[in-house]
């Protein structure tokens, strides 16, 4: 909200299921979830949610995000691996003419349900813009078993969260001041 209101130029966020990308798309911002290990998570942080939770940015433009990536990317202390650097930088790459891309656009949900007409038109307008820039654009809808995806996502998040909690608590039970009432029941 602060970026969309013009209070700040960028904001940090972590994204494991859309926490950066979804708010950005609702506010007219650019939300970016980079490749794993592109940005540091903090000393010895490892991976949140088995690598699905990734630190990223919300900005007003691709250019702002590229500048932030140049400023922030790199390994951190104790990182199990690191994404290789781009070379001459993300901001510099923006000024390079892009190669012709093959782009699939989807103006429905994964299950084929219609989306809001204004959103569908925005998707098609983006496709027309990409075509005008010389890219090949075609309709596409990934085939996805959405219930199975959600089950797998929930399992990964649950296990990742449990491992994170276990790493902090060790073998002791949580104290009442550490867990909300509902959480205490779930813990049992």
What do these predicted ranges mean?
Residues 1-76:
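Short glycine/serine-rich loop segments
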Residues 25-28, 151-158:
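Short low-complexity, flexible loop/linker segments enriched in glycine and/or proline
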Residues 109:
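Residue-level signal for short, function-critical loop segments
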Residues 60-87, 112-145:
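Acidic-enriched catalytic cores of C-N bond-cleaving enzymes acting on peptides and small amides
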Residues 17-18, 144-146:
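Positions that flank functional sites
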Residues 92-106, 156-188:
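Short helix-loop capping/hinge segments that flank enzyme active sites or metal/cofactor-binding pockets
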Residues 66, 124, 150, 159-162:
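Generic alpha-helical structural signal
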Residues 1-17, 106, 122-128, 133-134, ...:
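Gly/Ser-rich catalytic/binding loops embedded in alpha/beta enzyme cores
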């Amino acid at each position: 909200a602060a970026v969309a209101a013009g209070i700040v130029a960028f904001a940090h966020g972590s994204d494991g299921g859309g926490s950066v990308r979804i708010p950005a798309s609702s506010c007219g911002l650019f939300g970016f979830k980079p490749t794993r290990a592109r940005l540091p998570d903090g000393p010895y942080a490892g991976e949140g949610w088995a690598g699905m939770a990734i630190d990223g940015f919300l900005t007003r433009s691709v250019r702002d995000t590229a500048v932030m990536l140049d400023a922030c990317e790199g390994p951190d202390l104790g990182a199990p691996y690191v994404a290789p650097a781009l070379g001459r930088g993300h901001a510099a790459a923006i000024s390079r003419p892009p190669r012709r891309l093959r782009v699939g656009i989807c103006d429905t949900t994964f299950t084929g349900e219609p989306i809001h007409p204004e959103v569908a038109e925005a998707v098609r307008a983006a496709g027309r813009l990409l075509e005008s820039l010389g890219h090949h654009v075609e309709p596409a809808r990934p085939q996805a078993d959405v219930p199975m995806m959600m089950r797998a996502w929930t399992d990964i998040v649950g296990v990742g969260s449990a491992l994170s909690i276990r790493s902090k608590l060790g073998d002791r039970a949580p104290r009442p001041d550490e867990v909300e009432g509902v959480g205490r029941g779930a813990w049992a």
